[in-house]
Amino acid sequence: MKLIIFTGLVLFAIVSLIEAQAENEKACLPQYQVRTDAPGNCCSNLVCDCYGRYKSGARIGRNCFCLQKGVIYKREN
């Protein structure tokens, strides 16, 4: 009986480890890829930058972008 319980726990640990590795190996997001819910998994040469979206002074959401590291973006009028 103890052997069955131990085997079950070991199998559970192995499956959990495999799922965690698969989560870490997700494809990275390319440049200018937009995510609206949360910062994404940008590729290694990019950085994630998030901005709030507002309408009439009320926050209506958030956009996150994968942008080049070290590049400064300025708003043009």
Swiss-Prot record:
Coiled coil stretches, renumbered: none
UniProt modification remark: Contains 4 disulfide bonds.
Record key words, sorted: Disulfide bond, Secreted, Signal, Toxin
Signal peptide feature range: 1-20
Protein's cellular compartments: Secreted
UniProt GO MF annotations: toxin activity
Propeptide feature: residues: 21-26
Gene Ontology CC: extracellular region
This protein's record includes keyword Cell membrane: no
InterPro entries in the record: Spider_toxin_CSTX_knottin
Keyword Cell membrane part of the UniProt annotation: no
Record-linked Pfam families: Toxin_35 (PF10530)
Primary site of residence: secreted
Tissue distribution of the protein: Expressed by the venom gland.
Family assignment from sequence similarity: Belongs to the neurotoxin 19 (CSTX) family. 08 (U8-Lctx) subfamily.
UniProt protein name: U8-lycotoxin-Ls1w
